Amino acid sequence: MTFYNHKAIEPKWQAFWADNHTFKTGTDASKPKFYALDMFPYPSGAGLHVGHPEGYTATDILSRFKRAQGYNVLHPMGWDAFGLPAEQYAMDTGNDPAEFTAENIANFKRQINALGFSYDWDREINTTDPSYYKWTQWIFTKLYEKGLAYEAEVPVNWVEELGTAIANEEVLPDGTSERGGYPVVRKPMRQWMLKITAYAERLLADLEEVDWPESIKDMQRNWIGKSTGANVTFKVKDTDKDFTVFTTRPDTLFGATYAVLAPEHALVDSITTAEQAAAVAEYKRQASLKSDLARTDLAKEKTGVWTGAYAINPVNGKEMPIWIADYVLASYGTGAIMAVPAHDERDWAFAKQFNLEIIPVLEGGNVDEAAYTEDGIHINSGFLDGLDKACAITKMVAWLEETGVGHEKVSYRLRDWLFSRQRYWGEPIPIIHWEDGTSTAVPEQDLPLVLPVTKDIRPSGTGESPLANLTDWLEVTREDGVKGRRETNTMPQWAGSSWYYLRYIDPHNDEQLADKDLLKQWLPVDIYIGGAEHAVLHLLYARFWHKVLYDLGVVPTKEPFQKLFNQGMILGTSYRDHRGALVATDKVDKRDGSFFHMETGEELEQAPAKMSKSLKNVVNPDDVVEQYGADTLRVYEMFMGPLDASIAWSEEGLEGARKFLDRVYRLITTKEIVAENSGALDKAYHETVKAVTEQIEGMKFNTAIAQLMIFVNAANKEDELYVAYAKGFVQLLAPFAPHLGEELWQILTASGQSISYVAWPTHDDSKLVENDVEIVVQIKGKVKAKLVVAKDLSREELEKVALAHDKIQAEIAGKEVAKVIVVPNKLVNIVVK
């Protein structure tokens, strides 16, 4: 039987594309543009897994489709190659992280090319290349000049095992680090911060301008966390000190019965009484060992210590004890809260635990039993009594402003971005600290500030990066003789990925980040595909940097990515025991369609789970390509289900995709291809062109492939295949299975040219209309025959044809036809006596 020999055909076409630079980005200014971007990978030692190609195949289908539609297409690939894993590996093995990274990139590139993706490799970038990070550093110097990069002594998330501080976003809900799962403790350190908060309102508002999944927009909105309320100033009794509280409910001020400061609040030590000093100091020590997420966990037991001091409630003059508690964060709001236990669950639980006063100020509920968190008419609230929420807030804010103890305020949950890492393998921060106490950015002509090569990359142990050990690199002298010391912190991995999509546009430019006219031509990115796990971090950081560059006049658009799409996860085959525990696949025995634990004999339930080394269910694309071919992998991953769904990997599904491609190969290579159109496939072909075109545009790749299958089935029923329909079908197939598409195109045309730029087929609406219809002929309501007749045949003609049919003639022989009921295009019912 004829079949598609992927081992011969796929390498042949990959070599053809490389030799001919088939996918070089188009530069014809008269053509429309299409910029298709993948989230570039971190080149790990493990190489690609089958989850990577899902998103890459989707952008590749769109890129091939748009090229055929006459677009200039920019479809690049590169490497997000700085980061902790390479450094950790280097420390464990003694190898240079640069060498390790280069080897991994070579392996990734080999795997990617084996899958037939149409990348323009002339635009390949690598975040660890000095010619690339020169511009990462340049952006940092611009942030510094604008006051958006600054140094601060801040409590950081310190991970001893990693020897570095990490951002809030990199701490998991259980209080461990995203990288490695290590304990995270709070520790005050000198750090570089980026003032992303200055862009909070724009980052929020401009989400309305992009075509992104609403779920991702909501995650960003929640992270930015805008809230409107008031700042209220509380004086500390018997002192000249005060503190400010931000509250979204200033109308409940009459119900504030105590105040809580974050343990790190600057006021704590100075207001704590001698009797409470030891307890406060011990509580502060314990709080420093917890992450922000662990501290704010709603389910955890409430803890706190009284400082011995009192605040004065400005609205009624009452004394309020001042406590410290770890659920209040110094980094959020003002680091202090007014507690209204009658109407806040956390404050109520705290008040109950420590026997603090609870005063209801809203009608409804029983505050002895639980906090009342609904709206209600104000009570026990002096001049606010009888008012609803909105009126009471307005009146209280006016009172606060009149009396000078508060004012209206918009607050954000978003914090400034902790930007420095105490590690070696990252971009050096281009700042010099001089002995006269000043700091300056490295001038543009001296960039890049190259990361020095060293064998000693272990953390210094002092909280500084390993760069602090390299005296020759570290120490500098100015022309006027003033000595200085280079910044030893490096940038986080997020730096290089915050702007890489811009460098693809002009990757070899030594004079500027990218040419302005080219940026104007290509921005914004038309489609950006990647995992939803980057919803907050990477996407928010990239939007921030883009807006800064927009303000500097570097980029012409407010937003970087016009359309975002998150592909689903490809899950691995896995098994669970009766407790729900996952069992590694090499411990499972399959017998008679059931699954059993090899060691215990227990019958297991098959349950898809995320692919992992520990479960031994990771599928390597190299193995799939070897056995089935790259086109099979591509078609299978696109046919599994909707692109955004998480679906389990299936060997049977892979075999089904392969059988389909073999059927396509046989159809084109063994069917008689003819120059005359019989018309038999008109409707099937034009329906397929219309459907596949629309479904690619809508990224419904699974239904597009289903439509291709429908056409193959229809074509196989005919004795011959019209050559124009054969060519058109191969063009529709080519974005999904490009190697087979090229091979079949040569069989049909012998052109020696790639199919890539052949104009995309179009459909003819008139061919979508059925010219014939099937008519049911009944006698006394029972079906006796079915006829195929011309559509819209008249009642008289339909009656004549029905009565003349052989079967009907036999049924009515010798009987009198009393009546004939005709429903055009549907049925003829004959009534006989």
From Swiss-Prot:
**Which SUPFAM superfamilies does the entry mention?**
Anticodon-binding domain of a subclass of class I aminoacyl-tRNA synthetases (SSF47323), Nucleotidylyl transferase (SSF52374), ValRS/IleRS/LeuRS editing domain (SSF50677)
Q: CDD domains under this entry?
A: Anticodon_Ia_Leu_BEm, LeuRS_core
Give the chief site where it resides. cytoplasm
Residues binding ATP: 613
EC assignment: 6.1.1.4
In terms of Pfam families, this protein maps to: Anticodon_1, tRNA-synt_1, tRNA-synt_1_2, tRNA-synt_1g
- Spell out the molecular function terms from Gene Ontology: aminoacyl-tRNA deacylase activity; ATP binding; leucine-tRNA ligase activity
| Keyword hit for Cell cycle | no
Locate the motif 'KMSKS' region: 610-614
Q: Which UniProt keywords apply?
A: Aminoacyl-tRNA synthetase, ATP-binding, Cytoplasm, Ligase, Nucleotide-binding, Protein biosynthesis
Q: Which GO biological process categories is it annotated with?
A: leucyl-tRNA aminoacylation
Name the residue ranges of motif: 'HIGH' region: 41-52
Localization (cell)? Cytoplasm
Gene Ontology CC annotations of this record: cytosol
What's its catalytic activity?
A: tRNA(Leu) + L-leucine + ATP = L-leucyl-tRNA(Leu) + AMP + diphosphate
Q: Which NCBIfam families does the record associate with it?
A: leuS_bact
Family designation: Belongs to the class-I aminoacyl-tRNA synthetase family.
Which HAMAP family does the UniProt record give? Leu_tRNA_synth_B (MF_00049_B)
Name this polypeptide is given: Leucine--tRNA ligase
Source organism per entry reads Streptococcus equi subsp. zooepidemicus (strain MGCS10565)
The organism that produces this protein has a lineage beginning with: Bacteria, Bacillati, Bacillota, Bacilli, Lactobacillales
